[in-house]
Amino acid sequence: MFPAQEEADRTVFVGNLEARVREEILYELFLQAGPLTKVTICKDREGKPKSFGFVCFKHPESVSYAIALLNGIRLYGRPINVQYRFGSSRSSEPANQSFESCVKINSHNYRNEEMLVGRSSFPMQYFPINNTSLPQEYFLFQKMQWHVYNPVLQLPYYEMTAPLPNSASVSSSLNHVPDLEAGPSSYKWTHQQPSDSDLYQMTAPLPNSASVSSSLNHVPDLEAGPSSYKWTHQQPSDSDLYQMNKRKRQKQTSDSDSSTDNNRGNECSQKFRKSKKKKRY
């Protein structure tokens, strides 16, 4: 097979193109049928794009699949015409019967599709393009194409961006409970009521240093409720009183002994000074 004939068997004719259609849009669209090697939109002598072009695939099997998949879909409101290229070995075959031997797809459903792009069960692929050189219409087309071939993005927007609870709600033990009756996208927040022991731990104040030093005991009043309390003083026993009085007496005697020792020392020093004065005379 000659190279020209082989390339013609891998190429499809795309007609009835709207003036805003660019080669990048056709590349993204026909990439669903298989890997591409070249996309061309014919132009006149003045450089203006014509209403037809050619898409060359890497494999000839992708040609019949592209015709069955994309023939008749609408780009900018105009249905495109996808056929075999003139001169190929299969150009005489009807376009709606060429793909039945490979995949059973009714191309009539795609010709009547009123959407911007056709449906496909294959995952959408993209190729890197310089964003600065693309028109605004291409990004609109690519955005709509992404929503068609990605069912995850068809969920309600607020389902994926539901606000997370802040630190205050997390600390107060908030639980997320979905409302099944209202639908999958609705939800409600229910507050978990703290138990009596939690209320007691949060509301009961701690004793200060004075109350701790005076040997105070915290006794909760169960009859008044979990958040009420009273303070009771522990009375010392008889043995404790005896020890306290004994310590006081020992302290008093030690103070008196130290005072008498000081007086004796002063008297001795005075006598020593007087004896020195007498010796001088």
From Swiss-Prot:
Short motif (Bipartite nuclear localization signal): ranges: 245-280
Single GO term (MF): protein homodimerization activity
UniProt tissue specificity: Expressed in brain, hippocampus, prefrontal cortex, cerebellum, spinal cord, testis, mammary gland, spleen and kidney. Also expressed in fetal brain.
Any Gene Ontology biological process: cellular response to oxidative stress
Domain RRM: 10-87
Any single GO CC term annotated in Swiss-Prot or TrEMBL for this entry: nucleus
Positions of the UniProt region annotated as Disordered: 184-281
SUPFAM superfamilies: RNA-binding domain, RBD (SSF54928)
Pfam families according to UniProt: RRM_1
Compartments (UniProt record): Nucleus, Nucleoplasm; Nucleus speckle
Keywords, alphabetical: Developmental protein, Differentiation, mRNA processing, mRNA splicing, Nucleus, RNA-binding
PANTHER family: RNA BINDING MOTIF RBM PROTEIN -RELATED, SPLICING REGULATOR RBM11
Role this protein plays: Tissue-specific splicing factor with potential implication in the regulation of alternative splicing during neuron and germ cell differentiation. Antagonizes SRSF1-mediated BCL-X splicing. May affect the choice of alternative 5' splice sites by binding to specific sequences in exons and antagonizing the SR protein SRSF1.
Subunit structure: Homodimer.
Full protein name: Splicing regulator RBM11
